[in-house]
Amino acid sequence: MKKILTVCVAAFLLVGCDDLFTPAIENNKQVSDGLNDPLYSEGILANAYTRNPYNSQSFNDVATDDAVTNQTSNSYLKMATGSWTSNNNPMDQWGSCKAAIHYINLFLAQVDQVSWANDPIVNKMFCDRLKGEAYGLRAMFNFYMLQAHAGYTEDGHLMGVPIVEEVETETSNFNYPRNAFDECIQAIYDDVQKAEDLLPLDYENISSDSEVPETYRSEGANYSQYNIVFGNNFRTRMSGRIALAFRAKAALLAASPAFADGSNATWAEAADYNGEILDLIGGVAGLAANGNTWYKNADEINNLTGGSNPPEMLWRNGKDATAYSLEQAQFPPSLYGSGQINPTQNLVDAFPMANGYPISDAASGYDAQNPYTNRDPRLNLYIVVNGTTMGTDGKTIDTSADNTSNNDGLNRENGYSTRTGYYLRKHLREDVYLSSTTTSGQPHYSPRIRYTEIFLNYAEAANEAWGPTGTGTHGYSAYDVIKAIRQRAGIKDENGNDPYLESIKTDQTKMRELIRNERRLELCFEGFRFWDLRRWDLNLNEPAKGVRISGGTYQVFDVESRTYNDFMRFGPIPYSEVVKFDALEQNVGWK
């Protein structure tokens, strides 16, 4: 079958009556038309790029113990409170990722036949780069499918997703069985290796012929030709570094408790793959000093040009020059926002004291009647608590139940006020101005992969593989990474030390708990908690809690239950797919 790709064009004017009865010129193209139209062929690959689930923020933290929402129609709210089924799945990646892989396979089937440039050397480089992008993207989409849909079947086998690497036609057998989980991990690794062989680590202009890779220099390529294909203009595309990051993410998933028994993966392998990326930036010394405030580093954001990355970003979305929609959705009502995402008391309690001790530790100095005093500075960066000042006018936010002067108080107005006593602060630029009559936006971008994630991946895997202070071949340990992250956050006692970290540095179990908690804090509201709880085999049903502040007292209360069945540690295969294809086994527990 010749795959038909249709472009719909709307006609706004009718010139004459005859036009009504004249057949319109068809604007349909065959895939094969791309052989002489490189822009069209590249558009097939571009279709896959548009399906990256991290092209925008989802705030699926609402489906965890870290947040609730005041939007009653929110799909994650419904999911967390009993409405998650195999045909109603807000976390589904099956349809979009399979479609992306289909387009990638179409592209790979013809990329070698397309005339990308008149110059044969430039043509070869374009062909290599685009193939490398396709392999890297296929690895990425298989990772996201695996994360969302891998699981144990009724016969006790850990299964992944069908591995599809050929073009599907009308004669294809679509009734594929699922591949084993470890086969899917290997397929990701294989595609990453192909991408690494074809792509530069990063897209950067070079200034001399001696810098041209030998593969192309031996064929006569000069630096000017190289820059046309592999230069700065392509910085936002799949690169060797990005592909390696998806191998590292897949390795961590495979080594995690929920998957380890059926994956043949090791923590050492996960540590090495993540460490390989960190070694490229100098290890712990490469931790960006302002990486934990990436969303509000105004000068850094405002000056981003040409796909360049801040030190914290391994891969990011494009910059929106004058945005304010996030602030409209998340600012408290007194700042003309809708306060949609409400962090929980559960998450607030996870932030330690400024001296580094958990608030449950007797040495912490925590005062339940002054709960926000002397806390980890990240609490005030990421969450609006009672008494926070924010916005262009430095407004004090009153989240108490006693507040009758505006709708910032607890449960004052449905759809606008906080349900937990807290509002979201992370992601927001407080130099955005909103009012009833005018708005003034500011540049924003969102991350796809932060280096902090890779550091935390490494710390988790290194602790499991070699203990808290073991370094493997990388020269730095889980302890070293966590120490650097907490120092960046401002964790220190009166002597500038981190006594809690020092007290647990030889205890693998306590270090594991600390690493998981640091991951929870550093990556909150970035789409990690939902998946982390599952791969760690932790309790999915911690009630989401809030705080009622009245008369100067703080009363913690249950805001919303979580009603996940135990089998919901693994997501479902879509019901529509299981019904159509009897070779496709459903994960245990799902219908």
Features from the language model and the residues they span:
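Extended amphipathic alpha-helical segments enriched in small hydrophobics
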Residues: R138-A139, R247-K249, P443-K492
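Short, surface-exposed recognition loops and adjoining beta-strand edges that mediate ligand/DNA contacts
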Residues: S58-N74, A150-E165, L201-I242, S256-I341, ...
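Flexible, polar/acidic helix-loop-strand segments at domain edges
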Residues: Y366-Y451
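Long, intrinsically disordered, low-complexity segments
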Residues: C17-D18, C97-A100, D182, A187-Y189, ...
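Bacterial Sec-dependent N-terminal signal peptides
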Residues: M1-N27
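Conserved, well-structured interaction surfaces
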Residues: D37, E42-G43, T50, N74-G151, ...
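Membrane-proximal, proline-rich intrinsically disordered regions
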Residues: C17-A63, N88, V114, F351-T373, ...
